[in-house]
C-alpha cells in the first residue's frame, strides 16, 4: 500500500515539474530547431538584450566548438 502511494506521489511530482518547466522554458517545447540559425543572425541590439546566463551559454558553446576533442569526434 505504501509503495503504491509512493509511486503515485512520484508520478504527480514529475507531472507538476514538467508543467512548471514548460511554463518557464516554452521554447524548449515549441519544436524550435532553428536555434543555431538564430545565433548566426544576432546583431548588436540582440547581444545587448541577452541575459548574463545566455552569454555564459554562448561562451561555453564557442569553447566546445573550438576544442580539439569536439573536432576529433566529427572527423
Swiss-Prot record:
KW Lipid metabolism (keyword) present: no
Keywords: Secreted, Signal
Endpoints of the signal sequence: 1-24
The keyword Methyltransferase appears for this protein: no
Superkingdom in the source lineage: Eukaryota
Subcellular location(s) per record: Secreted
GO CC terms of this entry: extracellular region
Primary location recorded for the protein, binned into one broad class: secreted
Protein family membership: Belongs to the non-disulfide-bridged peptide (NDBP) superfamily.
Record-given protein name: Anionic peptide
Species of provenance: Tityus discrepans (Venezuelan scorpion)
Organism lineage: Eukaryota, Metazoa, Ecdysozoa, Arthropoda, Chelicerata
Amino acid at each position: 500500500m505504501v509503495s503504491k502511494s509512493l509511486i503515485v506521489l512520484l508520478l504527480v511530482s514529475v507531472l507538476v515539474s514538467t508543467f512548471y518547466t514548460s511554463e518557464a522554458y516554452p521554447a524548449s517545447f515549441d519544436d524550435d530547431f532553428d536555434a543555431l540559425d538564430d545565433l548566426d543572425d544576432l546583431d548588436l541590439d540582440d547581444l545587448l538584450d541577452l541575459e548574463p546566463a545566455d552569454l555564459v551559454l554562448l561562451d561555453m558553446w564557442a569553447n566546445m566548438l573550438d576544442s580539439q576533442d569536439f573536432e576529433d569526434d566529427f572527423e
